[in-house]
Amino acid sequence: LGARVLIVDSIQTMHSERIESAPGAVSQLRECTAELVRFAKASGTAVLLVGHVTKEGQIAGPRVLEHMVDTVLYFESDTGSRFRVLRSVKNRFGAANEIGVFAMAEQGLREVTNPSAIFLSRHAKPVSGSVITVMREGTRSLLIEVQVLADLSLGGNPRRVAVGIDANRLTMLLAVAHRHAGLLLGGQDVFANVVGGVRLAETAGDLAIVLAARSSLQDVPLPNSLIAFGELGLAGEIRPVPFGEERLREAAKHGFKLALVPEANVPKRPPQGMTVRGVTRLNQALDAF
């Protein structure tokens, strides 16, 4: 073909005469993908295979397609949002879990060079139940806003609703906060949300979630200049998280002046203009404000 890039949309519609089955069958997927892989290796052409996905967002059909290719990328979007996230879940030649953020404009998709700007909302005045944390996506540090609303439950069983946060982990964090910090949320409906539609999959956001819950319960805003990260253990200890210095540098770059982090994540030289407080216990973190 003489082309540098070949895009096949979609691989489920491809058909090989060597296989007596309908397009989309497992045998057809395996044979067509193998033929395209051989072509890519022999010609040096970059081949992009577009695959169907299920309602759950996974590649449709058996995982044979994922096993045969070098890289698997998911193109994700939320209904009504102009932003799209390109996420790598497999990469034989580099780091997985990398993301690229794009915005849909009149001219088509355009790269968002500063993803933290779309996930982060800076309130003009501090509001209760809102805390900024720093999550890692591949090699990127992203600032995101965690919001928690605690409201008096009018039913017999208080609700626990989590959007962008694992619901089981939210329940566990509230139990730890009650046991080790005396946070009385048993009669409260608790709603937790990550702003911007992003999913907080790592434990580094634990401390921010509990701080936001206490802030909402007492209706006491935390400083606008604060960021917090750290994993919370069942014994009420604040455990260190990977890439602490990188997280702090990203926060300082966006103008945050105060950080509440695990003691083990306190750097010898904090970023210029930032005060970093280290904590080892949950009650120590809550007493800081």
Question: Which residues are covered by each model-predicted region?
Answer:
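Peripheral, non-AAA+ core regions of ATP-driven protein-machinery
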Residues: 1-5, 11-289
